[in-house]
Amino acid sequence: MLQGMPKRSGSISELHDPFSSPDVYYGPATDPRRQKQPNKYSRTRTMSIIENVSTFKSAGKQYNIRRRGSEDDSMLASSGHRKFYIKDVDKTLEELLESEDTDGNYQITIEDRGPKTLRVGTANSNGFRHVQIRGTYMLSNLLQELTIAKNFGRKQVILDEARLNEDPVNRLTRLITHQFWDSLTRRIDYNSIAAIAADTKVDTPGAKVPRIYVPHGCPEQYEYFIECSQLNPSLNLEVKYLPDVITPEHVQSLNESPGLLALAMESHRDPITGESTLVGFPYVVPGGRFNELYGWDSYLMALGLLDCNKVDIARGMVEHFIFEIEHYGKILNANRSYYLCRSQPPFLTDMALKVFEKFGGDQNPTAVDFLKRAFIAAIKEYKSVWMAEPRYDKTTGLSCYHPDGIGFPPETEPDHFDAICRKFAEKHNVTIPEFRCMYDAGEVHEPELDEFFLHDRAVRESGHDTSYRLENVCAYLATIDLNSLLYKYEKDIAYVVSKYFDDSITDYAGETTTSSHWEALADIRKQRITKYLWDEETGFFYDYNVHIGKRTSYDSATTFWAMWAGLATQEQANAMVEKALPRLEMLGGLVACTEESRGEITMNRPSRQWDYPYGWAPHQMLAWTGLDNYGFTGVARRLAYRWLFLMTKAFVDYNGIVVEKYDVTRGTDPHRVDAEYGNQGADFKGVATEGFGWVNSSYILGLKFMNTYAKRALANCTVPDIFFKHMKPEEKARYALI
């Protein structure tokens, strides 16, 4: 622009790009009602009228001027760049739902039987002329955008067509990066404590009171939360100390008054007042209905967060894990009082390393200190949790999921265990609720029920709740998944001690070790895993029942965790790809287990969500990484395309849905899961605002394997087998198809 030239005042279209975040796109600057001066969307368009009054023009010809119709066909040429003027958001939403949402679930999907078209006004004509929005995808995006606009209090909006027909791959990536992660982020502080402390999972009088338990050695946190409760008595917040030694008996005693467990906080100084206050580190939760920090979910979500450059949140979750190990003795299933005895699959070393690298690596002294604190905590967890009774099996030298605990898990539905309890209630001639109270109080002793709950708690600790692979036996299984993770701990600790800490580290107990010590532990575990878990004939790593001294034969996708951890030999990896993979590779990626291993499903033996035909993001991501590490990048790419296809297909056809798990055998409605708890992320009205944590990560990570050609195929929802069939030979090689 020439100097001295006045700058043209921007129109709405010039202020924001069509893919900006909702707070910008639907912010005050784009509200047509708040424009201080007329712009091209608020001025009335006039029509040129040529009358036949001039003798010059009428000489020999009569000009019949046709009025341009209100259906703005002239704009079709600019399709994709148009802007729509919605002058009444509420009314348009009502019309859209009445016309298109024929099943009344506040979503527009391929199952609705509406006309799949809606007339909306154009922005250039101030809504005078109209165009058609057609098809399930655009109409469902319109529903989503109008729902968001309404949530922002907007009565009128200018909508870019580009936002409605956005490439689905780009749209889902954008939503995950700029909206879903933000919606899933939590932080425990004065403003949020009441909402986060509230617990909907436990239905007892004591659970209705928001309550937080603070570790014995955290007086600053205790005073902080006491101050929170005093500053706002309406919160009705209870603040309580935990004892220095936490026993299963004490944990059970808290079940009538369950509460949130405090997490890591840091001191911040107010730049205005100069006063210091505590602020909780941020973390993300698995889904919108959760408020707790979960164990292995956090690692898998951190992978996506780091790729989206949200390092502060990933770092915050590592800080919370360090805090949990220091004060609660372990990384918890989640930070609620009834989880104090239960851990989850351990991923801390890899998580800390990945954050460290994004945090500046060894060039950043703060990052080095962070890494050291994380690994000292990991060593404590390794020794005191996984290599100690009751989880460590001395005979095999391997570890099991085997948490402590007494009585019924309080976070379950009241009638969840009625079937198993009925015969015991009848035996004692009492009702099921009465028996439950008697059992929890220790008034009756039932060894069979004790063992049932032992394995039930172990299944929950494994993260795979539930599966017939683990049911009624989990606490006795040295699983391939857990022992792969512990091998990774040993290798990671050896690497970090050697590379960053001068080959020496002193742990919480004052014991100093070197990298060779940890390498030796890893070598021993690798030998034992091969001895007890590897089956050369089938190409699977199985689990080993330490109670009866026998290897199982349940085909599970967790076999690939051995490749993720790097413990498999190249020959074992080759065998897994040749023999195990064909049994687990389905239309939409890896299935949790084979149909043969799962067995027959009946009324008395219903589906389990971690079994066939369901696929889970953790299994996909760990397998992709493992296969890639062993030179099977093409196989990883093929599996990633299959998984991304399912996600994209459901996202396009079902109103932007992103769910916890998918049926990897179905190409039409893969999000539909009937097993056990249903499917988290499916129950929303108008717009999905969070997705599901580790599934969000899987989409971000899976796309790293895709080139432009594959992304276009995904955007068109091209079925994997059709996509693979029509590839050129060089492309087929990239997917290990030839």
UniProtKB/Swiss-Prot annotation:
Region called Disordered, residue ranges: 1-44
Annotated positions binding substrate: 289, 296-297, 333, 342-344, 463
Gene Ontology BP, a term: trehalose catabolic process
One Pfam family, short name: Trehalase_Ca-bi
Entry's EC annotation: 3.2.1.28
Catalytic site: 465 (proton donor/acceptor), 660 (proton donor/acceptor)
Alphabetically ordered keywords of this record: Glycosidase, Hydrolase
Reactions it catalyzes: alpha,alpha-trehalose + H2O = alpha-D-glucose + beta-D-glucose
Signal peptide segment: none
Gene3D superfamilies from the UniProt entry: 1.50.10.10
Family classification: Belongs to the glycosyl hydrolase 37 family.
Protein name: Probable trehalase
Encoding gene (name): NTH2
